[in-house]
Amino acid sequence: VVVTSPQDLVSMIVAKAVNMAEKMHVPILGIIENMSYITCPDCGRKIEVFGQSNLDEVAAGYDLKVLGRLPIDPALAAACDDGTIESALPMGLLPEALAVCEAVEVRANADAEPAEPEA
């Protein structure tokens, strides 16, 4: 799994990660954008702190599946720091994080399915 963030220069780092994985014959399940946005606690609007996401374009450029976008969440960060992540948030993780985990699991299982025997 390649993890990126919304900044423009990150696409250069993604290129290095993809090239390294290909040279080492390591399959890439997809790409996740971390720190994608923060949700305003007053109005619920998503604010793109680091600028507009270019995740879809980066993913398309390397033929990667977008597995999800994770927000900046101060409550999640505090729970991680306190070691109380399992009890601090509903179901232990943000819904976005759960969706990313499920997408990774689906991709991993799809890649792990045995090939059809040759006739």
Predicted segments with their positions:
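Inter-motif core of Ras-like GTPase G domains
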Residues: 1-9, 14
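C-terminal lobe/tail of nucleotide-utilizing enzymes
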Residues: 18-119
